[in-house]
A protein has these predicted regions:
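Bacterial Sec-dependent N-terminal signal peptides
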Residues: 1-26
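Intrinsic-disorder-associated interaction segments
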Residues: 21, 58, 62, 134-137, ...
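Exposed beta-sheet edge and beta->alpha loop/turn motif
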Residues: 93-169
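Short, low-complexity N-terminal intrinsically disordered segments enriched in polar/charged residues
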Residues: 19-41
Length: 169
């Protein structure tokens, strides 16, 4: 009888841990997709919401970051770069630490650049400091792990940043 109770308790604890993991992954997907949709719509307020505070600080603060994002959105609207579709793939890596949760997630983008169709396979670094309730993202396409660590010294060395690639049609 005692062994059965121990097994039931162990099973319930395992299910609880799994459900907690699913909650933070679900939140990450929801927020990464919100950011992807904001990219297509040119919604700079939402883009700023999911931009890591260290990146905002490096841009000179919220106001300057907002101006930089607005400038980027204006470039998109000018027609030289037209993002057709952005989708978020399945998490490839996750590291759970005491202070944060970090993950790598693919970001697939179909776009038109100066009249040429292109498909981009990028990777986002996602990080949360509150158990997965609120996520921040950084595109790793034009960065190295060393450069990312300048912004995020807490970046776990176990994470492998895959190389991004763009194909033109």
């Amino acid at each position: 009888m005692g062994k059965k109770i121990i097994w039931v308790v162990a099973l319930l604890l395992g299910l609880h841990t799994t459900s907690q993991a699913q909650v933070y992954i679900d939140n990450m997907y929801k927020q990464a997709n919100a950011m992807a949709n904001a990219t297509i719509k040119g919604d700079y307020t939402t883009l700023l919401k999911y931009t890591h505070p260290a990146m905002i600080k490096s841009m000179g603060g919220k106001e300057q970051a907002m101006a930089t994002i607005k400038q980027g959105v204006a470039m998109l609207k000018s027609g030289s770069l037209n993002i057709k579709k952005v989708s978020i793939g399945k998490v490839t890596q996750t590291v759970v630490e005491k202070e944060n949760i970090q993950c790598i997630v693919p970001q697939l983008m179909d776009m038109r650049i100066a009249g040429v169709d292109a498909h981009s396979n990028n990777y986002l670094l996602g990080i949360t400091y509150d158990g997965g309730k609120n996520w921040y993202f950084m595109n790793t396409a034009s960065s190295t792990p060393e450069k990312l660590r300048q912004f995020l010294p807490e970046l776990n060395k176990k994470l492998t940043i895959p190389k991004s690639n763009t194909t033109y049609k």
